[in-house]
């Protein structure tokens, strides 16, 4: 807190004294873009229950940084990065964000995965007026001028997944999630959506601690409820335990389908395609997405990290984030937060998932929706997709059922 107060006081004194344009006027953090380099922060869980997922996001960001540096950097400067471990704890994310912004004075930060970690740092980024580039799909119901939401809003992942299942004839839904803000808000949305579908019903809803490894009682409840499909919003290592214990009961996708929102290629590798094959996921990108840019991305990722490594939606969004920041800085001709923010409005880049564009009103991204099926080779293949990118609607204001149900943020 003292460091933050010193920062705020310095800005106040700078303004009152009307000092020169040098010094306190820049919200990049003074030393972040000095000399021939510009320094950014990377803030992800490299340890703890979320390391299984966040490591690939960090790796994609480093790959993008190295590619950009090799091509000449940003505004003639090479990118350097300071890396911090959020350790799968929201309070640690907050502490590390304070360090990156207050002590290291980085130009921007690429970071977080869980909504709990994002919410833990949100006020800190707003206090310092810096930008967090958040790479993961989330529950929506939020917009901040200090966060660029590179992952899907609920209308670009959750809502179309339920629509797809309903169209396929699934009627009985069991909701299972980790016990924190994303799954609970997602399931609030899903409950409202299912209530509006004729003949559909939620037959059960359960939550597990982030580090929970025992799922036998929950699986018994699922068996008793006999759903057509399990809607899975578990995160981290909980997914490994749940699906392996489901397999121990000899329950496969032929018996009971799952639709997951946080299982990507990395998690399939860890859990096993023999266990997950046939199940469904909803994202905006897969390693198998057929674009020229994606072929280049996958080739570069494997060349750097090994042929056995896989790309994923969050990793691709993190990779895109670094390139979108570069494009915004170059459009603005500046690393200053306000200049970069203004440059973001309507900015598009050619990404591995296809062309993506920033909505300047809410700093979310237009994205193509892709429903995927996990196959025996461990990859995910598109089985349904929108014809074009879907504009973000983080507050679901365009859905009558959401408005009528009074869907609202959960803290």
Show which residues each predicted segment covers:
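Short, low-complexity disordered leader/linker segments with a strong preference
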Residues: 1-39, 70, 395, 402-411
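Immediate post-signal peptide segment of exported/extracytoplasmic ligand-binding proteins
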Residues: 27-43, 70-78, 165-171
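Beta-alpha junction/loop-to-helix N-cap segments that form part of ligand/metal-binding clefts
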Residues: 28-32, 52-59, 71-141, 150, ...
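Extracytoplasmic "Venus flytrap"
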Residues: 41-60, 84-91, 113-114, 176-184, ...
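Periplasmic-binding protein-like
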Residues: 100, 104-112, 133-135, 174-177, ...
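Extracellular/periplasmic Venus flytrap/periplasmic-binding protein
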Residues: 139-140, 145-248, 288-294
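Extracellular/periplasmic periplasmic-binding protein-like sensory domains
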Residues: 246-319, 329-333, 385-410
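Segments of small-molecule ligand-sensing domains
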Residues: 304-312, 326-389
């Amino acid at each position: 807190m003292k460091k933050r107060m010193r920062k705020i006081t310095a800005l106040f004194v700078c303004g009152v004294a009307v000092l020169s344009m040098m010094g306190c006027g820049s919200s990049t953090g003074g030393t972040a873009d000095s000399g021939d380099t510009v320094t950014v922060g990377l803030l992800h869980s490299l340890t703890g229950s979320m390391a299984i997922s966040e490591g690939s996001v960090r790796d994609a960001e480093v790959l993008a940084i190295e590619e950009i540096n090799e091509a000449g950097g940003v505004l003639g400067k090479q990118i350097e990065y300071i890396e911090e471990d959020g350790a799968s704890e929201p309070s640690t994310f907050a502490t590390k964000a304070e360090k990156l912004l207050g002590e290291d004075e980085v130009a921007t930060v690429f970071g977080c995965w869980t909504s709990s970690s994002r919410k833990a740092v949100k006020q800190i980024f707003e206090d310092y007026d810096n930008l967090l580039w958040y790479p993961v799909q989330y529950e929506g119901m939020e917009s901040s001028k200090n966060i660029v939401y590179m992952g899907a809003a609920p209308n670009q992942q959750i809502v179309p997944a339920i629509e797809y299942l309903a169209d396929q004839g699934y009627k009985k839904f069991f909701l299972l999630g980790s016990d924190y803000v994303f799954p609970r808000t997602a399931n609030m949305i899903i409950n409202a959506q299912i209530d509006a579908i004729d003949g559909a019903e939620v037959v059960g809803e359960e939550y597990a601690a982030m580090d929970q490894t025992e799922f036998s009682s929950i699986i018994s409840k699922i068996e008793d409820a006999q759903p057509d499909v399990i809607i899975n919003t578990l995160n981290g290592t909980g997914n490994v335990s749940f699906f392996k214990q489901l397999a121990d009961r000899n329950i496969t996708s032929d018996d009971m389908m799952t639709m997951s929102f946080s299982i990507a290629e990395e998690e399939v590798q860890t859990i096993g395609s023999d266990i997950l094959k046939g199940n469904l996921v909803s994202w905006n990108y897969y390693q198998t997405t057929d674009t020229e840019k994606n072929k280049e991305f996958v080739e570069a990722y494997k060349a750097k990290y090994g042929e056995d490594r896989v790309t994923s939606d969050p990793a691709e969004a993190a990779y895109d984030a670094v390139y979108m920041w570069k494009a915004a800085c170059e459009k603005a001709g500046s690393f200053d937060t306000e200049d970069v923010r203004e440059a973001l409005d309507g900015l598009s880049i050619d990404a591995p998932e296809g062309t993506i564009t920033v909505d300047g009103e809410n700093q979310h991204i237009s994205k193509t929706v892709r429903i995927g099926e996990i196959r025996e080779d461990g990859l995910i293949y598109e089985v349904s997709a929108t014809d074009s990118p879907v504009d973000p609607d983080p507050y679901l204001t365009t859905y009558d059922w959401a408005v009528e149900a009074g869907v609202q943020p959960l803290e």
